[in-house]
């Protein structure tokens, strides 16, 4: 009898507790179906094209669409109000986290967090915090397009155009006479730059400029018996990375490039040190000093061979 009285008393206390009102943002119980009521896959409403991307693979446990039936709200946050039935005079609120400029962008940190909730464990974004792009308030969706089957950032032939939307000087350089084969689709920005953060300068994939260049130009790495100090120090002492009006991406055409260092103590007469109409004028120094990057020949101290 005492036990029953005790249980009754506990039950009464529980019932007497005031209900805690939950007025915070709510998830739409309909999940993605609630979104498809308005958003469909066609030219006018392409939002649900995300269904054809890796983000909507339900069989993948890490996919946003596989989590608690939340679908779109896995990224956009609890947005039941956005999908609610409204009266004609009511204004539809934006999703909790909005990536669309037409409805007003959410703060960069909120948009970043929506992506990093899943991607922070992946190595390529480990250095995002504090990177040049992060400090410039570039968000993931400033570059990536999620509601399309073909994200241009993941397409080697399209990626550069997306980067050029901010890096306009590099677009100009890439159209110069001498350039890396960007327009030809053979290389792209991320072959040299780690856009999510890097230990190297200028978001390079290597720790130094030279290490980055050597990933393709391995024959220039050395070590050489007779090294050329400016080359060993930095490829950019002689070359422009994104494009040049001079052959081989040179900053200045030969022989003038060489003379920027070798002018004062040249071992040649003035006809060679100050080329004019001589037969050496077109290629100048490299007519003889062909191994400008270094030489392993026993007699290659002058980089003649």
Residue map of PLM features:
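N-terminal secretory signal peptides that target proteins for export/translocation
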Residues: 1-2
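Bacterial N-terminal signal peptides
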Residues: 5-16
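Short sequence/structural segments immediately N-terminal
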Residues: 19-305
């Amino acid at each position: 009898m005492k036990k029953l009285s005790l249980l009754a008393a506990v039950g009464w206390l529980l019932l007497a507790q005031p209900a805690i009102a939950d007025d915070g943002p709510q998830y739409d119980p309909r999940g993605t179906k609630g979104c498809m009521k308005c958003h469909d896959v066609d030219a006018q409403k392409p939002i649900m094209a995300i269904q054809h991307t890796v983000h909507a693979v339900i069989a993948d446990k890490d996919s946003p669409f596989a989590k608690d039936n939340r679908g779109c709200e896995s990224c956009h946050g609890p947005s039941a109000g956005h999908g609610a039935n409204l009266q004609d005079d009511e204004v539809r609120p934006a999703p909790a986290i909005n990536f669309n400029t037409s409805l007003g962008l959410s703060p960069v940190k909120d948009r970043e967090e929506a992506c990093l909730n899943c991607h922070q464990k992946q190595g390529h974004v480990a250095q995002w915090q504090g990177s040049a792009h992060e400090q410039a308030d570039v968000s993931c969706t400033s570059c990536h397009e999620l509601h399309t089957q073909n994200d241009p950032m993941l397409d080697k032939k399209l990626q550069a155009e997306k980067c050029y939307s901010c890096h306009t000087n590099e677009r100009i350089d890439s159209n110069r006479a001498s350039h890396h084969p960007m327009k030809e689709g053979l290389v792209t920005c991320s072959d040299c730059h780690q856009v999510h953060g890097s230990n190297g300068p200028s978001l390079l994939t290597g720790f130094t400029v030279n290490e980055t260049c050597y990933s393709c130009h391995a024959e220039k790495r050395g070590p050489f018996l007779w090294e050329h100090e400016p080359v060993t120090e930095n490829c950019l002492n002689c070359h422009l990375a994104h494009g040049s009006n001079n052959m081989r991406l040179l900053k200045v055409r030969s022989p003038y490039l060489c003379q920027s260092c070798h002018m004062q103590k040249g071992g040649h007469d003035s006809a060679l040190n100050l080329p004019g109409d001589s037969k050496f004028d077109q290629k100048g120094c490299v007519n003889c000093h062909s191994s400008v990057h270094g030489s392993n020949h026993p007699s290659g101290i002058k980089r003649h061979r």
